[in-house]
Amino acid sequence: MSKKGRSKGEKPETETDSVQMANEELRAKLTNIQIEFQQEKSKVGKLRERLQEAKLEREQEQRRHTAYISELKAKLHEEKTKELQALREALIRQHEQEAARTAKIKEGELQRLQATLNVLRDGAADKVKTALLADAREEARRTFDGERQRLQQEILELKAARKQAEEALSNCMQADKAKAADLRAAYQAHQDEVHRIKRECERDIRRLMDEIKGKERVILALEKELGVQAGQTQRLLLQKEALDEQLVQVKEAERHHSSPKRELPPGIGDMAELMGGQDQHMDERDVRRFQLKIAELNSVIRKLEDRNTLLADERNELLKRSRETEVQLKPLVEKNKRMNKKNEDLLHSIQRMEEKLKSLTRENVEMKEKLSAQASLKRHTSLNDLSLTRDEQEIEFLRLQVLEQQHVIDDLSLERERLLRSKRHRGKSLKPPKKHVVETFFGFDEESVDSETLSETSYNTDRTDRTPATPEEDLDETTTREEADLRFCQLTREYQALQRAYALLQEQVGGTLDAEREARTREQLQADLLRCQAKIEDLEKLLVEKGQDAAWVEEKQVLMRTNQDLLEKIYRLEMEENQLKSEMQDAKDQNELLEFRVLELEVRDSICCKLSNGADILFEPKLKFV
């Protein structure tokens, strides 16, 4: 009996010891998990502090760079202004030198022309007049050709400069368009990626929150069960101690009553046997009940261990997911860095465009100042109080008329010399017919030399031979029929040649001409020539007094055209600059939103990790924050 009771008492002790050991192991594991969770929490806090420090350092560097860039801009502006001032002074000096040189040249020409005019007024010989006229014409022609070549060269240079500026502007516009298209594409891709990541993160957050809620409910249920089981184990231990005490008492009683058993009467022995059987039966039932309870506790402990392993697996899965989210956030961080680099490139390009715009505005201001200075120097009152534009147009028109009428003057001078020679030879003979005048007037054109020779031959034949070609002259009755036929054939050939020359002249002039119209046009042209020469002399005197040249008109027109082109370019560049500034502002706003979103995702990730690991964090405030 004592051996059986001892063996039955040792079995519950071993089982309760194993239960206590398992509980202690579970508590040690729980403390280790909490320690690891606290370590991870401290690591996350340190990483967040490092991130904040890195952001502060980046902001400080950005401010330092912006201050340095502003200083460089100020220095560059000062240097440019100094260079432009020096260039402006050099150009002003050069312009003054050229104006003085042209004034000297014009004064010399005026003196020479005045001398020739005095000679003409004094009544010099015709040969001297023609020589002086030819010299003056040749010199004027040479000066005009030189001026024209110089102006053509300047026009070609300005065209080349304009072409280069247009090419640079087109290249700049194409590059800006390409950059804008790349930025739009990158912005759209970035926006799509952000929306996709946002949807995935929200989906994962909802799923993780649902899982966290379920895990929390499971943890609460397990804690309740653990408390119930701890109470049951405590109660079982108390029952075990009570049973041990009862067993000890029973054993002591058996030991005390075992020696006088023989001396007892038989009735008393039967009673003792009955009592011993009842005690043994009670011990067996208690042992079975304890064994059942221990088996139940073992099953509960196994269930708790299984749930603990499941929770550990879920924790590992959550850690893996947190690492995966960190890996997914790395491309976003890299994209953010790339966007920052693109923003910096855009800032540099905008700065370059601003510098170009400033240079163009400075050039425009210089051109305006130059035009205003020239206008102030060249501002004068015309003879009829005409405006400056009408004076310019009149000067251009008069220049063309002078070029056309110089040829007419040459023709008239040659015709006058020929008529003087013919008058000397003929004396009091008849005047040449109007046909010869018409032929000679148009025959001495620079482009029809054949008509000139033919008219001279026809005039000579008319003067010497007295042919019957003109009805105004009397026919010689002594001439023979053969001579008349020969002269008639010669005159018909000359007449056909003159018709061909006249047709060519009609093609050149563009209309039909007769002698009376020619005389009227000649008189009108002479009057116009004198009037234009007077106007030209007046204008040249005014220009010489002002120290300017006739090329000022063309220069001013070219400058006005270039100024208009520059204004249009400046307007286009301002529009492009405003567009780029708006795009830059949109990109900055988007970058700030992305940074805020990244921080939000980091906070959510840290909250998810804490909620998945955590026993020390309340659930409801974090849920409200999410």
Swiss-Prot record:
The alphabetized UniProt keywords are: Coiled coil, Cytoplasm, Cytoskeleton, Membrane, Microtubule, Phosphoprotein, Protein transport, Transport
State whether keyword Iron-sulfur applies. no
Query: Phosphothreonine is carried by which residues?
Result: 470
Q: Give the start-end ranges of region Mediates association with microtubules.
A: 1-365
Q: Which Gene Ontology terms of cellular component type are present?
A: cytoplasm; membrane; microtubule; microtubule cytoskeleton; ribonucleoprotein complex
Positions of region (Disordered): 1-25, 452-481
Region feature (Mediates interaction with TYK2 and GABBR1): 365-626
Amino acid composition bias (Polar residues), ranges on this chain: 452-461
PTM annotation (Phosphoserine): residues:
382
- Membrane topology annotation: Peripheral membrane protein
State one Pfam family annotation: JAKMIP_CC3
Question: Biological process GO annotation list?
Answer: cognition; protein transport
Tissue expression, as annotated, is: Specifically expressed in brain and testis by spermatogonia, spermatocytes, spermatozoa and Sertoli cells (at protein level).
Family annotation (PANTHER family): GOLGIN SUBFAMILY A MEMBER 4-LIKE ISOFORM X1 (PTHR18935), JANUS KINASE AND MICROTUBULE-INTERACTING PROTEIN 1 (PTHR18935:SF6)
Q: Which family does it belong to?
A: Belongs to the JAKMIP family.
Record note on quaternary structure:
Homodimer. Interacts with JAK1 and TYK2. Forms a complex with GABBR1 and KIF5B/kinesin-1.
Under which name does UniProt file this protein? Janus kinase and microtubule-interacting protein 1
The organism is Rattus norvegicus (Rat)
- Give me the gene this protein comes from: Jakmip1
